[in-house]
Curated annotation (Swiss-Prot):
HAMAP family for this protein: IspF
Enzyme class: lyase
Gene3D superfamilies the record matches: 2-C-methyl-D-erythritol 2,4-cyclodiphosphate synthase (3.30.1330.50)
Organism per entry: Vibrio vulnificus (strain YJ016)
Entry annotated with the keyword Lyase: yes
Role summary: Involved in the biosynthesis of isopentenyl diphosphate (IPP) and dimethylallyl diphosphate (DMAPP), two major building blocks of isoprenoid compounds. Catalyzes the conversion of 4-diphosphocytidyl-2-C-methyl-D-erythritol 2-phosphate (CDP-ME2P) to 2-C-methyl-D-erythritol 2,4-cyclodiphosphate (ME-CPP) with a corresponding release of cytidine 5-monophosphate (CMP).
Protein name, UniProt field: 2-C-methyl-D-erythritol 2,4-cyclodiphosphate synthase
InterPro entries, per database record: MECDP_synthase, MECDP_synthase_CS, MECDP_synthase_sf
Tree of life domain: Bacteria
Pfam short name (any one): YgbB
GO biological process: isopentenyl diphosphate biosynthetic process, methylerythritol 4-phosphate pathway; terpenoid biosynthetic process
Length: 158
């Protein structure tokens, strides 16, 4: 049996950089405002994994109303989510992550993001795709107000 999950996350720019995205520090003059480290890519990916096993979303498991998660490392949250996936008898087939941002430029960091995600999800890098796009200066991402990310995962019964 296979299961598919979809995740989405958005964070607004603010404060000092860098931007943490895909588990990688990307130099930028601003960071992202969030309760945790604000890693929109890993948040969307975590939501996709939780959705695939019908386990809600990261807000349910790591609420921003709980100081325990303040400044949390999203890579650790992702690992915890993947532990839940494995407990349900599934493993990752593949993941596809789309970062939507006018800035900063993501291309130089994509390979490092793929490596970090593959490591955290205990899979081969060939099972992880990360790509970035702009909105051609349209909308809040085009105005450089924040970053959005979508993620899709395929899980396979072990």
């Amino acid at each position: 049996m296979i299961r598919i999950g979809h995740g989405f996350d958005v964070h607004k720019f603010g404060g000092e950089g860098p931007v943490i995205i895909g588990g990688v520090a990307v130099p930028y003059e601003q960071g992202l405002i969030a309760h945790s480290d604000g890693d929109v890519a890993l948040h969307a990916l975590s939501d996709a994994l939780l959705g695939a096993i019908a386990a809600g979303d990261i807000g349910r498991h790591f609420p921003d109303t709980d100081d325990k998660w303040k400044g949390a490392d999203s890579r650790e949250l992702l690992k915890d989510v993947y532990r839940r996936v494995k407990e349900q008898g599934y493993k990752l087939g593949n993941a596809d992550v789309t970062i939507i941002a006018q800035a900063p430029k993501m291309a130089p960091y994509i390979d490092a993001m793929r490596e970090a995600i593959a490591h955290d999800l205990e899979t081969d890098i060939r099972n992880i795709n990360v790509k970035a796009t702009t909105t051609e200066r349209l909308g809040f991402t085009g105005r450089k107000e924040g970053i959005a990310t979508e993620a899709v995962v395929l899980l396979i019964k072990q």
